[in-house]
Curated annotation (Swiss-Prot):
This is Potassium-transporting ATPase potassium-binding subunit. It comes from Geotalea uraniireducens (strain Rf4). The chain crosses the membrane at residues 6-26, 67-87, 136-156, 179-199, 283-303, 312-332, 359-379, 389-409, 411-431, 450-470, 489-511, 519-539, 559-579. Belongs to the KdpA family. It is a multi-pass membrane protein. The gene is kdpA. It is found in: Cell inner membrane.
Length: 592
C-alpha cells in the first residue's frame, strides 16, 4: 500500500472503533427499554403501534413462542413480496413498463430478500420497477435486518438471565430495532449519499445519443435465448451498432443506505456498488463500508454491556478484527501481485480487472472483505475477476459462517455459538465442566451450537456436489475446470450463508438454481436462527454458577486467540478439500 492507502485504512478503523462503544451502549439502552435521545420522538409512535397491533409490551415470550413469531413474521413478508413480483406488470411506479417476474425467479427473489441474502438472479434496472424496489426490496431490507438483530438480542438475554423462561417479546424488539436504530441511521446515511452524488428520483430512464457510435459483434440467439452455432460448432454472430444509450434512474439513495446498514447487499443496479449512481466517490465508498460494519461491530459492545462485563464484548471484537485485517492483507497482496499469466507476457502490475479506478486497490480490498466477512454481499469490484487467491479470500470469509463481524445480528449469534464450542473443547482439555458467563455448557447447548455453525457448511457442500453432477447445474457454468468449481462453490456458499455476492460467471436464473438456491437460503437462515433461540432458551433457565479457580476466563487474550483458532480450524476442516480443488488448484495451474 502507498502512504495514502495506509492512512485511509487506518483512519477508517480508528473512526469505526471510536463509535463502537457509544453506539453499542445506545443499542443496549434501546433493547433494555431505557430512555435514549430519541425516546421523546419515538415512544409515542411505539406505543401507538402496540395499541394498533394489540401487542402487550410486557408479555415476554419463551424461546418457542419467540421462534414461532419470528417465522410467522418472515413468512408473511416472503409471501407478500412473492405476490408483488408476480403482479409487478400491473402495479404503479413502473415507468419502463417492466413485466412480472417468472414464478421461479419470483420465489428465489422473495426468499432472498426475506432471509437478508439479497441474491439477485436478475439485473435491478432491467427487471424491477420503482414500486418493487421501494415497497418490496427496501422494506425487506429493514425487516430482514431487524430479524437478525433481535435474534442476537434474544441470545444475549439467554446468556445473562437466570432461572427464566423468557427471552423478550419479538414484536417489541422488532419495533424498537426499526424505530430507534434502522430508520434514523438510514435517513442520515441516505442524505449523506445524496450529497456524494447518489441519485434519488422517480424519473423515467433517460435515452441519450452517444458522441461516437460503437459497433461490435454479438452472438445470435434462438427463441429460447440459446446461442446459435454453425456446422462447425462456432457461435454465429451479428454486427450491432449502438448510437444511443439508456441511463437508468430511480430512488437509489434511500435503498442504498439500508442496503449497507442492514448488511443486505442487493443492488438497485446490476453493477451494485460499482455503479456510479450507487457509489460515486471514494468517500461514499468508505462510508458504505462503515455502514456495513457499524451495527455488527456495535453489537459486540451491546453484548458486553448487557452481560455486565464489557471486556467480553471487546474480546469478540478483537477476534473479528484480527481475522478481517488478516483477510485484507492477503487480498491486497494477491491482487497487487497481479495475474501470473499476464506477467508471463511481460506485462507487470497489479490486477485491476473488474475494479473501479476511483476506488483503487485499497478501497476494493476493504469493501470486498467487509462485504463477505458480513452477510452484506454488496460489491464494488467484480469478484469473478479476482486472482484465484484474491477470490479465495471473500469465499473463505463467507465459508467461515460469516462471523467476522457477520450480518447484523447473525454475526454475533453465530460467534456466540463458536464461543460455546470453544469453551466446551477447552473444558474437555483441562478436565473441567465448561462454563460461559456463569452458565454450564451441557449436551443441549453443544447440539444447538454445532447445528448453528455447521448447518450452512453442510448445505454448501451438498448443493455444490449436486450441481456438479447434474446437467442442470453444469449447463449454467460459463467456465470449466477449477474456476468453474469455484463459481458453483461461491454461489451456494453465498446463498447458504445469506451473503448474496457472486462469481458472476455462473448463470443463476434457471429453474435448477432458482429452486435449489431458495432452499439453501431458507435453511441457511432459519435453521441456525431457531437453533440459537433453542440454545438461549435453555441457558436462560439455568442458574448462575459463581466462577472458581477452574473457570476459563473468556474475556482475556488467551481465550480470544483460542477462539480464533477454533473458528479457523472448523472452517479448514470443513472446506479445505473443496478450496484445494477450486481456487488453490487454479492458482497453481496459473503459476506453472
Amino acid at each position: 500500500m502507498n502512504p495514502y492507502e495506509w492512512l485511509e485504512t487506518i483512519l477508517f478503523f480508528v473512526v469505526l472503533l471510536a463509535l463502537i462503544k457509544p453506539f453499542g451502549t445506545y443499542m443496549a439502552k434501546v433493547f433494555q427499554g431505557e430512555r435514549t435521545l430519541l425516546s421523546p420522538v419515538f415512544v409515542p409512535c411505539e406505543n401507538l403501534l402496540y395499541r394498533i397491533c394489540g401487542v402487550d409490551k410486557d408479555d415476554e415470550m419463551g424461546w418457542k413462542r419467540y421462534a414461532c413469531a419470528m417465522l410467522l413474521f418472515n413468512l408473511v413478508f416472503a409471501v407478500s413480496l412473492f405476490a408483488m413480483l408476480l403482479l409487478q406488470g400491473i402495479l404503479p411506479l413502473n415507468p419502463q413498463k417492466l413485466p412480472a417476474f417468472s414464478w421461479p425467479l419470483a420465489l428465489n427473489t422473495a426468499i432472498s430478500f426475506t432471509t437478508n441474502t439479497n441474491w439477485q438472479n436478475y439485473g435491478g434496472e432491467a427487471a424491477a420497477s420503482y414500486f418493487t424496489q421501494m415497497f418490496g426490496f427496501a422494506v425487506h431490507n429493514f425487516t430482514s435486518a431487524a430479524t437478525g438483530i433481535v435474534i442476537a438480542i434474544a441470545a444475549i438475554r439467554g446468556l445473562v438471565r437466570r432461572k427464566s423462561s423468557a427471552l423478550g417479546n419479538f414484536w417489541v424488539d422488532t419495533t424498537r430495532c426499526t424505530l430507534y436504530i434502522l430508520l434514523p441511521l438510514s435517513l442520515i446515511a441516505a442524505i449523506f449519499l445524496v450529497s456524494q452524488g447518489v441519485i434519488q428520483n422517480f424519473s423515467p430512464y433517460k435515452t441519450v445519443p452517444l458522441v461516437q457510435a460503437t459497433s461490435f459483434e454479438k452472438p445470435r440467439l434462438d427463441a429460447k435465448g440459446t446461442p446459435i452455432k454453425d456446422a462447425k460448432g462456432n457461435p454465429v454472430t451479428e454486427s450491432v451498432t449502438v448510437k444511443e444509450v439508456t441511463i437508468p434512474m430511480g430512488p437509489v439513495a434511500s435503498q442504498e443506505a439500508i442496503k449497507e446498514l442492514g448488511t443486505n447487499g442487493g443492488g438497485f443496479f446490476n453493477a451494485n456498488s460499482a455503479h456510479p449512481f450507487e457509489n460515486p466517490t471514494p468517500l461514499s465508498n468508505i462510508f458504505e463500508v462503515f455502514l456495513i460494519l457499524l451495527i455488527s461491530g456495535g453489537l459486540t459492545y451491546t453484548f458486553g454491556r448487557m452481560a455486565g462485563n464489557t471486556r467480553q464484548g471487546w474480546a469478540l471484537l478483537a477476534v473479528m478484527l484480527a481475522i478481517l485485517i488478516l483477510a485484507i492483507g492477503v487480498f491486497y497482496r494477491a491482487e497487487s501481485s497481479g495475474n501470473p499469466l499476464v506477467a508471463k507476457l511481460g506485462v507487470h502490475g497489479i490486477n485491476m480487472e473488474g475494479k473501479e479506478t476511483r476506488f483503487g486497490l485499497a478501497g476494493s480490498a476493504l469493501f470486498a472483505t467487509a462485504t463477505t466477512g458480513t452477510s452484506c454481499g454488496a460489491v464494488n469490484t467484480m469478484h469473478d475477476s479476482l486472482t484465484p487467491i484474491g477470490g479465495m479470500v471473500p469465499l473463505s470469509l463467507i465459508l467461515l459462517s460469516e462471523v467476522i463481524f457477520g450480518g447484523v445480528g447473525t454475526g454475533l449469534y453465530t460467534m456466540l455459538a463458536f464461543v460455546v464450542i470453544a469453551v466446551f473443547v477447552a473444558g474437555l482439555m483441562i478436565g473441567r465442566t465448561p462454563e460461559y458467563l456463569g452458565k454450564k455448557i451441557e449436551v443441549r447447548e453443544m447440539w444447538m451450537s454445532i447445528t448453528t455453525v455447521l448447518a450452512s457448511g453442510i448445505l454448501v457442500l451438498i448443493f455444490s456436489g449436486i450441481a456438479m453432477i447434474l446437467p442442470a447445474g453444469v449447463s449454467s457454468m460459463n467456465n470449466s475446470g477449477a474456476h468453474g468449481l469455484s463459481e458453483v462453490l461461491y454461489a451456494f456458499a453465498s446463498m447458504s450463508n445469506n451473503n448474496g455476492s457472486a462469481f458472476a460467471g455462473l448463470n443463476g436464473n434457471t429453474l435448477f438454481y432458482n429452486l435449489t438456491g431458495a432452499v439453501a437460503m431458507l435453511l441457511g437462515r432459519f435453521v441456525p436462527a431457531v437453533a440459537v433461540l433453542a440454545m438461549a432458551g435453555g441457558l436462560a433457565e439455568k442458574k448462575y454458577v459463581p466462577p472458581s479457580l477452574g473457570t476459563l476466563p473468556t474475556d482475556q487474550a488467551p481465550f480470544a486467540l483460542w477462539l480464533t483458532l477454533v473458528i479457523l480450524i472448523v472452517g479448514a476442516l470443513t472446506f479445505f478439500p473443496a478450496l484445494a480443488m477450486g481456487p488453490i488448484a487454479e492458482q497453481l495451474i496459473m503459476m506453472r
